[in-house]
């Protein structure tokens, strides 16, 4: 499960059982995120959480990291048997927006920030899976 953590809302993405294709799952209001993840994990198999690392171009942490790090700590404590992979999330929102344009979504649909968060999480998860799969080939 990929988590594009945001202060207000968080995009989530998951993969198929053989880990080939990442798919947008939903956008959750961040205050409800932890409850949503616990309920999801109770009914679906999740062995890895992929969480973005928010950095500036000079590799320094962005302001978002002050919110992301406490969440990652909470996730680690609640799910000690699950892997937490950290990935660079720079440009994922821009890539998500471009994906929406390329797919022909109307301007009104592209303004839906929740969709951008879901697509950004999907991009993070697909990149992570591509990296893992290339490592094992």
Predicted feature locations:
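Phosphate- and other anionic-substrate recognition elements at nucleic-acid/protein interfaces
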Residues: 3, 7-8, 13-137
């Amino acid at each position: 499960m990929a988590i594009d953590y945001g202060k207000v809302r968080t995009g989530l993405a998951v993969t198929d059982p053989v880990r080939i294709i990442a798919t947008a799952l939903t956008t959750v209001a961040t205050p409800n995120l932890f409850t949503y993840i616990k309920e999801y994990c109770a009914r679906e198999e999740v062995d890895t959480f992929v969480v973005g690392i928010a950095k500036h171009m000079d590799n320094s942490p962005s302001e978002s990291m002050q919110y992301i790090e406490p969440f990652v700590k909470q996730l680690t404590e609640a799910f000690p048997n699950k892997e937490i992979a950290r990935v660079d999330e720079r440009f994922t929102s821009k890539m998500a927006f471009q994906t929406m344009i390329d797919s022909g979504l109307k301007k009104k649909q592209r303004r839906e920030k929740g969709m951008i968060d879901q697509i950004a999480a999907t991009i993070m998860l697909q990149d992570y899976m591509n990296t893992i799969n290339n490592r094992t080939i």
